[in-house]
């Protein structure tokens, strides 16, 4: 377990997982990808110069489960920071509420440090992420045209 490739409607994004820093989170993401959980799932939230967020099979931003059941605990480390574009973190609704939703940063987002588990980074396909960040959205930051994960491949 080391990488996951997201084959999206705009191109491929290769993600390196930080298995030493966030083993439980990485196992969750990797297993969900391997089992096809993310296949066909949309990026339901896109905010330019901030994040692209996906991983909710309901497409609402309120759904998703983990391989551990409903939610699982954060794995936050003081040596990992949201320093720039391409950081992979868990989306959550507060402390220890991780499930299947994740986001990829499009810029430095230091105010997220200590609040979201960082568990990987984009090693190829950052231009795809940046293009996603330019997609037209509605007033709820939802893309007008769906951005899909066609297939998530555990490598």
UniProtKB/Swiss-Prot annotation:
Q: Which PROSITE patterns match?
A: CSA_PPIASE_1, CSA_PPIASE_2
| Catalytic activity line of the entry | [protein]-peptidylproline (omega=180) = [protein]-peptidylproline (omega=0)
In the UniProt record, does the keyword Isomerase occur? yes
Does this UniProt record's set of keywords contain S-adenosyl-L-methionine? no
Report the InterPro entries cross-referenced here: Cyclophilin-like_dom_sf, Cyclophilin-type_PPIase, Cyclophilin-type_PPIase_CS, Cyclophilin-type_PPIase_dom, Cyclophilin_A-like
The record's keywords, sorted A to Z, are: Isomerase, Rotamase
GO terms (BP aspect): mRNA cis splicing, via spliceosome; mRNA splicing, via spliceosome; protein folding
A cellular-component GO term for this protein = cytosol
> Which Pfam families does the record cross-reference, listed alphabetically?
Pro_isomerase
Q: Where is the PPIase cyclophilin-type domain?
A: 1-154
Q: Which domain of life is it from?
A: Eukaryota
Function summary: PPIases accelerate the folding of proteins. It catalyzes the cis-trans isomerization of proline imidic peptide bonds in oligopeptides.
Q: Which family does it belong to?
A: Belongs to the cyclophilin-type PPIase family. PPIL1 subfamily.
| PANTHER family according to UniProt | PEPTIDYL-PROLYL CIS-TRANS ISOMERASE-RELATED (PTHR45625), PEPTIDYLPROLYL ISOMERASE DOMAIN AND WD REPEAT-CONTAINING PROTEIN 1 (PTHR45625:SF4)
- What's the protein called, per UniProt? Peptidyl-prolyl cis-trans isomerase ppi1
User: What organism is the protein native to?
Assistant: Schizosaccharomyces pombe (strain 972 / ATCC 24843)
Q: Print the organism lineage.
A: Eukaryota, Fungi, Dikarya, Ascomycota, Taphrinomycotina
